Amino acid sequence: MALRAPTLLLLLLGLLLLPLLPGLPPRATGCPAACRCYSATVECGALRLRVVPPGIPPGTQTLFLQDNSIAHLEQGSLAPLAALRHLYLHNNTLRALESGAFRAQPRLLELALTGNRLRGLRGGAFVGLVQLRVLYLAGNQLAKLLDFTFLHLPRLQELHLQENSIELLEDQALAGLSSLALLDLSRNQLGTISKEALQPLSSLQVLRLTENPWRCDCALHWLGSWIKEGGRRLLSSRDKKITCAEPPRLALQSLLEVSGGSLICIPPSVNVEPPEFTANLGEDLQVACQASGYPQPLVVWRKVPQPRDGKPQAQAQLEGGAPGLGGHGTRDTGSGMLFLTNITLAHAGKYECEAANAGGKARVPFHLLVNASRQQSQQLPDPQAPATRPVGHEPQHEAGSMAFRALGLATQTAITAAIALLALTALLLAAMICRRRRRRKKVPAPSGEGTLFVNDYSDGPCTFAQLEELRDDHGHEMFVIDRSKPLFPEVLPEEAPEHNPPDGLKSGLRLPTRVAYEIHC
């Protein structure tokens, strides 16, 4: 029994010291609900979370948030977690990353974003991650990697981009990744990749490019030569078999087996119909730039600025599909539509459509004129139909001026001639009217005009038959007056006008003018 007492004492002491052992950390206080927390690790996976839960201990170094429904990562949601080194956000529903979302995690070494719904990456999405070593972006919906996307990751060693929909990798997309050792671009939609895109990767040791629809043309000639010369060491035996998908004559052939003479390109040709168009104020306009070539050219619209004070200005690219007169132009494969909405005089001027592929570049100008007044909308002709020039040439301005001097010389001359012609016509009409009035004044009035002849023919009312007989030899009508009323006012003999009626009217009486008489029949 004496030996058993110390043994029991040691067992009790061991149970008291067991929570203090480093292998079994105690449960931390302040752990988010339903999460499991340890001294430096917090597990919140598969809890149907929609946001990062509050209350995570500030000293957390490893955070598991996988298999949830987090769709938005706000900029300040991770701000208290400055000590974080491993963050697992895979299999969520993230659609975008705000600029500076990880600014407060300068010690982060590993970031897992696999299996989300990211469609694009902003240039400042990874600002602050100066110590990041591994970045998982596989299994998203990325389609383009723009220039300087990973510029703020100088110590990144592994970049996993497989199983996306990447079809465009810009020349400076991987700029700044001087420490990158592994790049996985397999199972994407890449048709080509430029030599300039891989130049910043001075520490690259593993490159995965398989299962992409490679277009074997002149733009990919460098890749075959690079693999044969020194890039072979970066590729596994599987990755060396880069299979062509285009053109059809080279389909399913390995790039390394295709001769350099078969990797050809067709320079682009470009056409805009009509080359000049007249638009009205306030209307919308769509202009198609048809480009052809192999590979399919990339099309960009630019507005050629008017020089000021003899100094040419830089060209402004236009967004294909978006209105405006500046900004960054977007590339469009083939359709090449220029969209202008609510046209003003500032839209007038010269535009340029540029098509480019690995075989070269081609440009074509387009001239836009704007009517000063609103008119009925004009429709552009169908690009497939024969070219027709726009109808109607009203006062047009190529700049913002509304002055008469802004018009062309031919337009000014036409307006001046029209005004002079109208003035001459008005003078001729006035002269003709005056001449006719003078002729009317000179013509004498016919004899007997304005004279009323009265005949005392009946002693009473007359019939219509008698009225037909009351006409003199010259056809004048003879009217019958009432004898019961005086015929004339009393007129002095010296005031009576002298009048000799014509022959055949001796029995008639001439009534004085400006005197009213009552005549009964």
UniProtKB/Swiss-Prot annotation:
Which segments constitute the LRRNT domain? Answer: 24-58
Boundaries of every LRRCT domain copy = 212-267
This protein's major location comes to membrane
Q: How does it sit in the membrane?
A: Single-pass membrane protein
Query: Where would I find glycosylation on this chain?
Result: N91, N342, N371
Region ranges (Disordered): 306-330, 374-395
Query: Which processes are annotated in GO (biological process)?
Result: positive regulation of synapse assembly
Q: Which PANTHER family match?
A: IG(IMMUNOGLOBULIN) AND LRR(LEUCINE RICH REPEAT) DOMAINS (PTHR24366), LEUCINE RICH REPEAT CONTAINING 24 (PTHR24366:SF129)
Q: What is this protein called?
A: Leucine-rich repeat-containing protein 24
